[in-house]
Amino acid sequence: MPERPPVAEDPFPQWVEALQRRHREALTFAEVRKGLQALSSLYVERRQKLAGGAALEGSGKRAAFALYYGPAHFLLVRAIVRQLGAASAPLRTIADLGCGTGAAGAAWALETGAAVEGIDRSGWAA
């Protein structure tokens, strides 16, 4: 597989806009907000339900995860890759195990020019 150069223009704003269009097409702002509140409650107050897949039950929680946690994970991983100088590591492929939305693997891959392979047990994942 040929190496690709890192992305020069920041794709983050366009990606977030596309996420908004995709998820707000089917749900209202209030439904996404309610999903984010329920998802946050799971993470903070009812963590025992996470192992059973409760975080991704329902379209509101899935949209909230994609719209809030996906971009947060993207920005966090991109900052880590930049701070560690990991973009200079010679990578061809990044295996993103438990990829979820794929945001973390995408952030690293965009910094390095590597391909990314996302693997997740959820059918909803990227």
Across the structure, where does each feature detected by a protein language model lie?
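N-terminal auxiliary segments of SAM/dcSAM-dependent transferases
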Residues: M1-G52
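Conserved SAM-binding loop of SAM-dependent methyltransferases across substrates and taxa
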Residues: T101-G113
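Compositionally biased amphipathic helical and low-complexity segments enriched in hydrophobic
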Residues: Q37-S40, R92, E111
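Conserved Class I S-adenosyl-L-methionine-dependent methyltransferase catalytic core
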Residues: A30-A87
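Conserved short alpha-helix immediately C-terminal to the canonical SAM/SAH-binding motif I
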Residues: W124-A125
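Conserved class I S-adenosyl-L-methionine
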Residues: P90-G100
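Conserved SAM-binding motif I beta-strand of class I
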Residues: A115-D120
